[in-house]
Amino acid sequence: MNALGKHVIAEFYECDYETINNHELVEDIMLKSVDLSGATTIKSVFHRFSPYGVSGVVVVSESHFAIHTWPEYGYCAVDVFTCGDLIDNQAALDYLKEKFGSKNVSVVEMKRGVLNLGVDLHHKPVGN
């Protein structure tokens, strides 16, 4: 890969209301998705809005996983930005789809930091 990272933008539709409105559960699911991807968690912050909705981010040594939920519409927006090519984004997305009960997922992936170095960039940053 001749890019510093991958940015996956995923939209989860027809999700379970109770699941995506529970900030503790959403955080647990996001943290597990990080583990399944092979990324390294540094810190997470999640917030529940009133009357509904959750936003949160998991900072990983490889970049971040972020989520915003709209339970009233059964919808979640997820960003997974990871550096290097050793992280399994698909494993994370498959787990999120299952746990959110999503019946329809749309995914766009783009390379970030495309550099003309003439070599593949194989790395997995190590957090402090």
Curated annotation (Swiss-Prot):
Which Gene3D superfamilies would you find in this protein's record?
3.30.160.750, S-adenosylmethionine decarboxylase domain
Give the positions the UniProt entry annotates as the active site: 63 (schiff-base intermediate with substrate), 68 (proton acceptor), 83 (proton donor)
User: Which of UniProt's keywords are assigned here?
Assistant: Autocatalytic cleavage, Decarboxylase, Lyase, Polyamine biosynthesis, Pyruvate, S-adenosyl-L-methionine, Schiff base, Spermidine biosynthesis, Zymogen
Q: For site (Cleavage (non-hydrolytic)), what residue positions does UniProt give?
A: 62-63
Keyword Disulfide bond part of the UniProt annotation: no
Give the pathway.
Amine and polyamine biosynthesis; S-adenosylmethioninamine biosynthesis; S-adenosylmethioninamine from S-adenosyl-L-methionine: step 1/1
Cofactor(s) of this protein: pyruvate
Q: Which GO terms describe its biological process?
A: spermidine biosynthetic process
> Which reaction is recorded as catalysed by this protein?
S-adenosyl-L-methionine + H(+) = S-adenosyl 3-(methylsulfanyl)propylamine + CO2
Query: SUPFAM superfamilies, per this entry?
Result: S-adenosylmethionine decarboxylase (SSF56276)
InterPro entries reported for this sequence: AdoMetDC_C, AdoMetDC_fam_prok, AdoMetDC_N, S-AdoMet_deCO2ase_core, S-AdoMet_deCOase_pro-enz
How the cofactor binds, per note? Binds 1 pyruvoyl group covalently per subunit.
One Pfam assignment: AdoMet_dc
Modified positions (Pyruvic acid (Ser)) are: 63
HAMAP family linked to this entry: AdoMetDC_1
**Stated family:** Belongs to the prokaryotic AdoMetDC family. Type 1 subfamily.
Q: What does this protein do?
A: Catalyzes the decarboxylation of S-adenosylmethionine to S-adenosylmethioninamine (dcAdoMet), the propylamine donor required for the synthesis of the polyamines spermine and spermidine from the diamine putrescine.
- Protein name (record): S-adenosylmethionine decarboxylase proenzyme
Q: What organism does this protein naturally occur in? A: Leptospira interrogans serogroup Icterohaemorrhagiae serovar Lai (strain 56601)
